[in-house]
Amino acid sequence: MDNTHLIESSLRHQFLTMFRTDNAFIDGILTVMIISLLSYIVKQFSDLPSVIGNIYNKIMIKIRLFFRPKSADKISKTTIIESLSEDKKPNELYTAVYWFLTTNIDLTVDSNVKMSFTKKIELDEYKELKDKNINKNMSYGTKKIFNYTHNNMTFEIEYFFATNLVSVYTDKKRDKENHIIYLTTLIDPNIRFDVFEEFTKMCMREYAKSLVDKKWVQKIFTNNNGRWTETVFITDVNLNSYFA
């Protein structure tokens, strides 16, 4: 049962009795004012529980949203590229990706770097090294991060190198070292392409281009006032036109 009307009637009776002046004109004005004021006050108090309830519900919704487990916006994706395929044959994809990572990633400030030079160390006619390209590679197990962009989306890819031994059966069983590249990144679950497939294709293209750029060059050397100078005589690019 709604007690609002009973409360309003009781308060109106008490206020009219309290402020009665026995002057009909003044009492009439006071009655109108008191009734209007009490109606407004009682209405506000009757609406108060619903107002408080609405505020409480909104606060609780905010609290539940804040403390509920966050759904992951992105998922972790990992791929493994081994130097030996499943049938124990050389994996050319590994060669391309390894070339890209060791050629195009800056190792200048890395704390763990392996250095090697596998060619014969020789001097040229100017007493300078013929080949100054020292191989610099990451130490196995050391993680490194680089950014890869595809379709205007940038991915932060973490990678590291590792090895294991696999058994190869020919005329007899032999253990062979298998080199591994681990690649990991975070992707949007709604992504419409395979980021690692696109990345490895890019590595293959760049690796193939690097092989094409290694042109055969024939040089002639001329002694000019005691100093030898070299001139490119023939490259493989114009061999056909040269002998045509």
UniProtKB/Swiss-Prot annotation:
Subcellular location field:
Membrane
Q: Is Membrane among this UniProt entry's keywords? A: yes
The residues that carry sugar chains are 137, 147, 152
Keywords in alphabetical order:
Glycoprotein, Membrane, Transmembrane, Transmembrane helix
What cellular component terms from Gene Ontology apply here?
Answer: membrane
Q: How does it sit in the membrane?
A: Single-pass membrane protein
Q: Does the keyword Methyltransferase apply?
A: no
Q: Where are the transmembrane segments?
A: 26-42
* Principal place of residence: membrane
Q: What is the protein's given name?
A: Uncharacterized protein L573
Origin species, per record, is: Acanthamoeba polyphaga mimivirus
